[in-house]
């Protein structure tokens, strides 16, 4: 919670330092796995506007490669990242991955379906 207070109030603005704090919370603090997954997701969101493709995929990799609460959310962020970079095929691939999940977040699934119908229908 302290990290989010620091971020929300712009008390730390150095991206490298902020990412180090995220890494400490993920790797060194004893937390429930789903809480760690939430922190990974928030780290991905924090970096999504400035990270390059490999950095973003690396951050989200633990979430998109395992069954967890944040998997569909992470796939959606990556799909939107590619969409914003005009990489439509990659974007479509990640939106479709959401639809193929066994238990995606229902709202994320609806948003992915809308995006596919609106922007990728032939």
What kind of feature is each model-predicted range?
Residues 1-2:
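Short extracytoplasmic
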Residues 8-14, 19-122:
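Soluble extracytoplasmic domains of inner/organellar membrane proteins
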């Amino acid at each position: 919670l302290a990290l989010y207070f620091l971020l929300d109030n712009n008390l730390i603005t150095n991206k490298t330092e902020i990412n180090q704090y995220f890494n400490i919370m993920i790797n060194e603090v004893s937390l429930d796995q789903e809480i760690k997954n939430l922190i990974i997701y928030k780290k991905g969101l924090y970096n999504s506007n400035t990270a390059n493709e490999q950095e973003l995929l690396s951050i989200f990799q633990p979430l998109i490669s395992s069954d967890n609460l944040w998997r569909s959310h992470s796939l959606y962020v990556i799909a939107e990242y590619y969409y914003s970079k005009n990489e439509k095929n990659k974007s479509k691939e990640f939106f479709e991955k959401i639809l193929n999940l066994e238990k995606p977040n229902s709202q994320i699934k609806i948003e992915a379906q809308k995006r596919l119908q609106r922007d990728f229908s032939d």
